[in-house]
Amino acid sequence: MEANREKYAADILSIKEAHDRIKPYIHRTPVLTSESLNSISGRSLFFKCECLQKGGAFKFRGACNAVLSLDAEQAAKGVVTHSSGNHAAALSLAAKIQGIPAYIVVPKGAPKCKVDNVIRYGGKVIWSEATMSSREEIASKVLQETGSVLIHPYNDGRIISGQGTIALELLEQIQEIDAIVVPISGGGLISGVALAAKSIKPSIRIIAAEPKGADDAAQSKVAGKIITLPVTNTIADGLRASLGDLTWPVVRDLVDDVVTLEECEIIEAMKMCYEILKVSVEPSGAIGLAAVLSNSFRNNPSCRDCKNIGIVLSGGNVDLGSLWDSFKSSK
């Protein structure tokens, strides 16, 4: 399906432009394979290791593109966002590279390792309550006080274009891929991947992986409109956001299916990433593998014929204490 910028917030041209813009700063992450996981799944799996990206997650691509897209006057005043996780660290790092300030509104209770990354990369942490209304209210106040530019974690064409560069690289690295499995939360990652991949290879299938405790995307696809959940409950802290008005049209039109996973399936997949692939992956990053190994995927007619599957390991920022507790609880 042809994707154009008149219909969506990004397109293959903006994604290619983003790749040219950010290429000097990002890692071209490797694609790993495992005969053991191929045997378990009955398919050929290709793991795009964004857990090895700068900042420990795919988010650096979009944040870097957004920062580098600012003109000199905008950049001088800095950037602001509200985020509990990897976007916060990614934007801090992108701003540091450009030598501009980054104001990061972080909700109380955010994972310590992700807050530590913000501080490590020079972001100015401003605490909020854990509610979205508090995050947005404080971010708005910072905007008024500083004149900085808001960089939304996912509902932004520059962010979507940056994340889409993952698919450009993956399809250059492994041409025979017939499906890509992508974690879904706010939809910035899967929107970029879908727009790029389906422009390059229209027959490719894009499958979203989502926790059952935060299954707003699955519900939205069924309802044909954005469904927002009042409460989410999942170990995958990076997959609790709701779809945005820029990401929803792409998810609605270009994402072929959504596979929802139990917590135990996510934890087991994370263990496999450590024990078999030998890479550090957070729960949100491991959910793509969980999807491919699930009965839901195996029995889904839209997934059954997918033999060469790309899986985006989206991030690797996890508190070691929480990781250990998760592994112990799964025994």
UniProtKB/Swiss-Prot annotation:
Entry binding sites for pyridoxal 5'-phosphate: 86, 186-188, 314
Modification N6-(pyridoxal phosphate)lysine occurs at: 59
Binding positions (Mn(2+)): 210, 214, 216
Catalytic activity: L-serine = D-serine; L-serine = pyruvate + NH4(+); D-serine = pyruvate + NH4(+)
Highest taxon of source: Eukaryota
Active-site residue list: 59 (proton acceptor), 84 (proton acceptor)
UniProt record similarity statement: Belongs to the serine/threonine dehydratase family.
Function, as annotated: Catalyzes the synthesis of D-serine from L-serine. Has dehydratase activity towards both L-serine and D-serine. Displays high substrate specificity for L-serine, whereas L-alanine, L-arginine, and L-glutamine were poor substrates.
Reported tissue expression: Expressed in the whole plant.
A GO molecular-function annotation: serine racemase activity
Cofactors demanded by this protein: Mg(2+); Mn(2+); Ca(2+); pyridoxal 5'-phosphate
The protein, known as: Serine racemase
Activity control: Inhibited by hydroxylamine. Racemase activity is enhanced by Ca(2+), Mg(2+), Mn(2+), and is decreased by Ni(2+), Zn(2+). Hydratase activity is enhanced by Ca(2+), Mg(2+), Mn(2+), Cu(2+), Fe(2+), Ni(2+).
Consequence of gene loss (knockout): Deformations and branching of pollen tubes grown in pistils.
Residues that coordinate or bind Mg(2+) 2: 210, 214, 216
Keyword Ribosomal protein included in the entry's annotation: no
Pfam family, one: PALP
Residues bound to ATP: 34, 54, 121, 278, 317
Quaternary structure annotation from Swiss-Prot or TrEMBL: Homodimer.
